[in-house]
Amino acid sequence: MKTIMMSCMMDGFPIEEIVSTAVACGMDGIDWVDLHGHTAAELKKFCRDAGLPITAHTGCKEGFLHRAPNAVEEFKTMLDDAVTLEAPVLMIPPFPRDGQRSLAEERKEYTEYYAEITPLAQAAGVTLTLESTGYGTSSIVGAQECLEVLRQVPGLRVTFDPGNVATLEDPLLAYCALKEYIVYLHFKDWQFSSVPAPGFAPVRSGKFVKDTLIGTGEMPLCELWSQMEARHKALPVNLETRDFEGKRSPMELYRKLVPEMKKW
C-alpha cells in the first residue's frame, strides 16, 4: 500500500514537521490539502529537499460553495498551485453549497461546474477528481450519483473514499460500479450510531457518524482492500486519520499505523 500523508490531518503543525513526520514514518508521499499559509513553491521545495513525492493537491477555496461569480477564476488559482506542486491529481470535493434547493439540482450545478473546469485541468496536464462527500446534505455520495456527473464530464475521475460512500451505501458495491474512474484513494474510519449522540454527525443514510482512528471503528477497510483490483492497490492512499482524542502525537500514531497498513 502506498500510504500518503493527508496534510490536513496535521493542521496547525509547521509544514516542516508535517513533512518530516511523513518521511520518518515511511509514508510514500503527501497530499497538500490547501497550502497551510505558504506558497505552492515553498511546499514543493520542502518536499523536494526531503525526498517526499507530492501525490495530489486538494483545493479548499470555497467560492463555488458560496456561489461567488469568480468561482472559475478561483479554480484557476488552485490549478496553478497544483501545477507548481507538480501534483498529478487535483481534487475538488463537491461539498454542499449555500442555498441548496435540492440534491438533484445541486448535482446539476456541480456537473456544469466540473464540465467547465475539467478541460482546464486537462490542458495543464493535471487529472481532476471528485469524491463522495459524507455530509447530511451532500448531493454526490452514492455510486449512481457520482456516475450521473462523470458520464457527462469526459476526463473527470474519482478519488474513492469508502468511508464517505458508507454514509449512504455499501462501499464495495460502489467500488465495483466506479472502478473504471478511480485514480486515487482516501481511507478513514467511522463509528456509527442509529440515534443522535454527542460528537456524531447526521449523514444521508439516516445514521450518525463520528471520526475515529483507522482500525478502531466500524469500516471494513482491510476487507475492502483485499477485494480491490491490483491496479487500484497500486494507487496512492491518503490516510485520512489521526488521534481524534489528542492522546498521541502524529509521529507516535503514524509510526505504528503505517507499517500495519502496508501489510494489508
Language-model segment annotations:
Residues 1-13, 61-72, 100-106:
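Active-site mouth loops of central-metabolism enzymes
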Residues 1-3, 7-23, 48, 86-87, ...:
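Histidine-acidic metal/acid-base catalytic patches
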Residues 6-10, 33-35, 59-63, 95-97, ...:
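Active-site beta-loop-alpha junctions enriched in small/polar residues
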Residues 28-29, 53, 88, 127, ...:
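Residue-level detector of anion-binding/catalytic polar loops
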Residues 31, 56, 91, 129, ...:
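Conserved beta-strand positions in the central sheet of alpha/beta enzyme cores
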Residues 31-48, 97-102:
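Glycine-rich, proline-tolerant flexible connector loops at the mouths of alpha/beta enzymes
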Residues 44-62, 111-121, 147-153, 219-222, ...:
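Alpha-helix-loop-beta-strand connector modules within alpha/beta enzyme cores
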Residues 67-160, 167, 251-252, 260:
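Active-site acidic/histidine proton-transfer and metal-coordination neighborhood
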